[in-house]
Design a protein with these regions (language model features):
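Conserved donor-nucleotide/metal-binding helix-loop-beta segment in metal-dependent transferases, i.e.
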Residues: 100-131
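Aromatic-acidic/polar surface patches that form glycan- and anion
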Residues: 20-28, 68-72, 120, 124-134, ...
Length: 240
């Protein structure tokens, strides 16, 4: 097991997007604009669905015909087994935006995993807390593997990965629901930077401190955060 991790500086990174089926996907358009402007990117890879307006990328189609969790697992398994993909890459969702210049991408967590689980179980105690249940199963597996006090890395930020280590993580959790980020980062002890998540759920004013933002469908289309992102990255990228 790798213990301790530093990500090398002064280099370019392969950016891997997992992309849902959406022929328009304006979030992806602006995410890529933000990457081209602010992130040390070498190549952009698209796993999943590729809108027709997107060009100058490396595309790996993945059929997504299941629910959210099974689709995610299929995408990650495809990435992990893609021998043509460099071992080191940075994983993006299509609703991640790089708002400031980044030289070296880091791992991000917001505290202990058990605290996040307890919060979710309390918040959703009167309904089925599926996500909390998934996180608890991952927490229990980490405990079985001797990893005490694991951190919560399930945030909406770009995340550096080793493809081979991703593959090992998926093998060790193949009987569990999907929560790859927290298992991977704790099992391989990547360390990182502690801070709050950057996901914006409010349509109005928002307060996010840091180099990244993430939106949902409504906040990107209708919210102040979406207007700010579109205004900041108003010029087409070389991938349009």
């Amino acid at each position: 097991m790798v213990r301790g991790r530093s990500v090398s500086t002064n280099k370019l990174y392969d950016v891997v997007y997992i992309v849902k089926e959406d022929p328009n996907n304006e979030e992806l358009r602006y995410s890529i604009r933000s990457v081209e402007e602010n992130f040390p990117v070498r190549y952009i890879w698209i796993f999943g669905y590729c809108p027709r307006w997107l060009s100058n990328i490396i595309y790996v189609p993945v059929k997504q015909d299941g629910d959210k969790w099974s689709n995610s697992k299929k995408l990650f398994e495809t990435i992990a087994n893609a021998s043509f993909l460099p071992d080191q890459f940075v994983l993006f969702n299509d609703d991640f935006f790089v708002m400031e210049k980044i030289d070296t991408p880091e791992h991000h967590y917001d505290g202990l995993l058990i605290d996040r689980i307890n919060y979710l179980e309390d918040k959703f105690k009167n309904i089925s807390p599926l996500y909390a249940t998934q996180l608890r199963q991952v927490y229990d597996r980490l405990q079985e593997l001797g990893i005490k006090d694991p951190k919560n890395y399930a945030l909406h930020t770009p995340m550096p990965f080793s493809r081979l280590e991703m593959k090992k993580s998926l093998e060790l959790t193949k009987d569990l629901p999907m929560s790859l980020r927290s298992f991977y980062a704790n099992y391989f002890n990547v360390g990182g930077v502690e801070g709050p998540d950057c996901k914006v759920f409010r349509l109005g004013e928002y307060n996010v401190d840091g180099p990244y933002l993430s939106t949902d469908d409504s906040t990107f289309r209708l919210g102040q955060v979406g207007r700010d992102i579109r205004a900041k990255f108003d010029k087409p990228s070389s991938h349009e």
